[in-house]
């Protein structure tokens, strides 16, 4: 029985300890149940579970809880959670501060960007105003350009009218001069007729027989040499302005006179022409400077030219002459092509005539110049010829020689330009500024077809005088200029 009692005692003690543990658990689990009720409940449960075993009941005095029950087993977890929460809060606070600083920075940037946007808007507004002002100024400029162009057109029309009027005046002056020549011719003829009649009357009085005396034809007045074959070929001569003027000046060939009367020396021992150039006329014995009929090789074109047989060594064909300003050289293309002026005064032979002359062999060019103080100089070029009209009479020059200075080589290889045919290399029309026709470059070192100013130095908006830049400069208009050509024997003048 003793071991059994000891065993029961240990069971009772374990039960009591379990009850205490259950009480603590009960206190933690619920706040409404009392410890006593908990013990009785356990007792009844154990009693019901084992009725066959012996049971012992231990009455343990009830303990009152006067303070808070601390459970040490859970305290580290709570502290750990609190620490975690504090760290998270600190991280969140730091993140919030960082976000706040970023927001403030963004606000500052937005404020700055807002200022820039306002400035950009202001600049755009100013740009629109400026564009409007520029457009307005551009329109004003266009109106001004159109107005000036209209003025230039009116000025060009006036210049053309002046040119036409000048041409009409020149034609009238030429006709008047021709009438004077005809009047002088008729007066001389009438005088000769009177002398012939008087001689016949005297002769009749001396002859005693009644045999009638044949009436001699009237003697011809003295005249410039004219080929007798001219009347047969007059219809073949080109009908330009120069040739028209010359046709009016042609005098009829002399009629045979009586042996007893005085007459001009016969020229039947000399060839009558036409000649290929003035040198051939000189070689045929015609050594007087005058008008000659010329027919270049390889063409049926007949032309009258002035042959200078006095300028050593003679045989020079004059293609241009300026001496008194009586002829206007500000002409159009067609006039420069055919020629114009008075062949015994100021004149231009014509581009087409010069082309045919210079393309029948090697010709040289001689330019003689004189200023208003009487100084004379010359410029000679070893070769001179023109290309055909299809090349706009392009200039071809050879080596220079002379004492006037070389102001023509710069124009070598250039095409001829007039007011209505612009072939120069300048952006504008050089003929408009130089007031003539020439082989302009951009524009001129020489302008021998320009305006003839009296006195030398002239005042003009442009350099439009008759000048040779290497001799007296571009603002000095020369007094006399002659351009003449001659076959080149490979020797300088």
Curated annotation (Swiss-Prot):
Modifications the protein undergoes after translation, according to the UniProt entry: N-glycosylated.
Principal place of residence: secreted
Domain Fibrinogen C-terminal: 269-489
Keywords: Coiled coil, Disulfide bond, Glycoprotein, Secreted, Signal
Spans through the membrane: none
A molecular-function term among this protein's GO annotations: signaling receptor binding
Disulfide bonds: 278-307, 430-443
Tissue: Widely expressed in heart, small intestine, spleen and stomach. Also found in lower levels in colon, ovary, adrenal gland, skeletal muscle and in prostate.
GO biological process: blood coagulation; cell-cell signaling
Xref: PROSITE patterns: FIBRINOGEN_C_1, FIBRINOGEN_C_2
Glycosylation: residue positions: 164, 192
Family annotation (Gene3D superfamilies): Gamma Fibrinogen, chain A, domain 1
Coiled coil: 76-115, 152-206
Localization in the cell: Secreted
Gene Ontology cellular component terms for the protein in this record: collagen-containing extracellular matrix; extracellular exosome; extracellular space
Secretion signal span: 1-22
Pfam families, sorted: Fibrinogen_C
Job description of the protein: Induces sprouting in endothelial cells through an autocrine and paracrine action.
Protein name: Angiopoietin-related protein 2
């Amino acid at each position: 029985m003793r071991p059994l009692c000891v065993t029961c005692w240990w069971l009772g003690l374990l039960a009591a300890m379990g009850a205490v543990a259950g009480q603590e658990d009960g206190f933690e689990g619920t706040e409404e149940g009392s410890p006593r009720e908990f013990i009785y409940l356990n007792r009844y449960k154990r009693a019901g579970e084992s009725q066959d075993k012996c049971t012992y009941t231990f009455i343990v005095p009830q303990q009152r809880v006067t303070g808070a029950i601390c459970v040490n087993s859970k305290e580290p977890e709570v502290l750990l959670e609190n620490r975690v929460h504090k760290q998270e809060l600190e991280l969140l606070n730091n993140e919030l501060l960082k976000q706040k600083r970023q927001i403030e920075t963004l606000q500052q940037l937005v404020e700055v960007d807002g200022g820039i946007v306002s400035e950009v808007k202001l600049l755009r507004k100013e740009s629109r105003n400026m564009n409007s002002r520029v457009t307005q100024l551009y329109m004003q400029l266009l109106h001004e350009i159109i107005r000036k162009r209209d003025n230039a057109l009116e000025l060009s029309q006036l210049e053309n009218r002046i040119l036409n009027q000048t041409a009409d005046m020149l034609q009238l002056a030429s006709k008047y001069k021709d009438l004077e020549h005809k009047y002088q011719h008729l007066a001389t003829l009438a005088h000769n007729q009177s002398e012939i009649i008087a001689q016949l009357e005297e002769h009749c009085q001396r002859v005693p027989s009644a045999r009638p005396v044949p009436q001699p034809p009237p003697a011809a007045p003295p005249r410039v040499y004219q080929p007798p074959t001219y009347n047969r070929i007059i219809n073949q001569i080109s009908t330009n302005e120069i040739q028209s003027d010359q046709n009016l000046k042609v005098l009829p060939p002399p009629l045979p006179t009586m042996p007893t009367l005085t007459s001009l020396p016969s020229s039947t021992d000399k060839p009558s022409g036409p000649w290929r150039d003035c040198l051939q006329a000189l070689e045929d014995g015609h050594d007087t400077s005058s008008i000659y009929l010329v027919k270049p090789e390889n063409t049926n074109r007949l032309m009258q030219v002035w042959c200078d047989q006095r300028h050593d060594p003679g045989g020079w064909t004059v293609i241009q002459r300026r001496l008194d300003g009586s002829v206007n050289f500000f002409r159009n293309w067609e006039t420069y092509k055919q020629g114009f002026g008075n062949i015994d005064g100021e004149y231009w032979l014509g581009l087409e005539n010069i082309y045919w002359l210079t393309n029948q062999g090697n010709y040289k060019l001689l330019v003689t110049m004189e200023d208003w103080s009487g100084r004379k100089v010359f410029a000679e070029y070893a070769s001179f010829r023109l290309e055909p009209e299809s090349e706009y009479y392009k200039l071809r020059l050879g080596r220079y020689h002379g004492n006037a200075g070389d102001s023509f080589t710069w124009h070598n290889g250039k095409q001829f330009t007039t007011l209505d045919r612009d072939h120069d290399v300048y952006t504008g029309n050089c003929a408009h500024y130089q007031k003539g026709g020439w082989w302009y470059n951009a524009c001129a070192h020489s302008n021998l077809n320009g305006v003839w100013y009296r006195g030398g130095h002239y005042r003009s908006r442009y350099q439009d005088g008759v000048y040779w830049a290497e001799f007296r400069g571009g603002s000095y208009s020369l007094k006399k200029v002659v351009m003449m050509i001659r076959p080149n024997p490979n020797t300088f003048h």
